[in-house]
Amino acid sequence: MVEKNNLPTLIRIFSYSILAITFVFLINNVLTVWFDWPGIKKLFSQFGLFGFRRLSTPLEGLSVALAFIQLLFYFISILLVYFYVRKSIEQTLETDAEILTKIAGYIIRSSFWAVLILGIVDFIISFMVVEKLFNEAIKFKLVNPSFRITFIHFPLVLISFIIGYFTRSVGFIWLAVLVVGSEFAIVLSRFIFNYEQAFQGDLVRFWYAALYLFASAYALMHEGHVRVDVLYTGFSEKRRAWTNSIGSLVLGIPLCLIIIFLGMGGKASIINGPALSFEITQQGSNGLYLLYLMAIYLAVFAVSMLIQFTSYFMSSSHKILNN
């Protein structure tokens, strides 16, 4: 029988374990997809475990060791969670929820700055390439997706995460204004100046997708998601806490995990595939080189929502136990 005094500790271990396992999965995904580590699926297939078919070409030597290391990461993450919870035994669920909310907020802020800066910079580059404002040597490098993404996009993403650390506000209102302004600029250039290029429409789609996916976790942080308001508004604080707790645990968290695990299930999956191949616009060098990032949007959406749903679950559990 679990004593009531132990429930907060168990909830903390359970909640942090979900996030820790997901974090390890993301690390293993990078190791498997980008660095050709075997992954734990092949390890299970090696021994025919959990219904996996045995490999036609068994793993050998270093590959087996790397696969076991990837499996070991999961056990280490659970142990770290346990020791962290035991070390901070006096910390309340509400405090944990606030910490997770800050982490989710940082991810969202940084992602906002990334799409803003990358959109503007890549728009300028595409415009100058189309209008032949670069010499042939520079143009040859800039139309190469690997060069453009590695030496321009990645550093800008890093700068965006630095900016996100020092800022505290999220400019989704400004991003919405920029989407409208970009669409308005397309109308003006098309019907007044008879000028239209693929990168103009790409920019609108790039920002528009970010606006909805990134703002989702932000709205959840500020109670902005719609429930059955006719019922919810009449609930007591305890019933609201039960609703939020069960909803997060049964609907929110599983949805995010499904997106992450299926979207990164292999090299050709919906998130890994475009990111691995540096997929760009279908318009060639006339468009923005940001299509691969729109696949990564799904991962950012799922991770930020997962963190915030876990925060929601912990804060709601705190209210239930206190009442």
For the regions a language model picked out, list residue spans one by one:
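Alpha-helical transmembrane segments and membrane-interface helix-loop junctions
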Residues: 1-234, 238-323
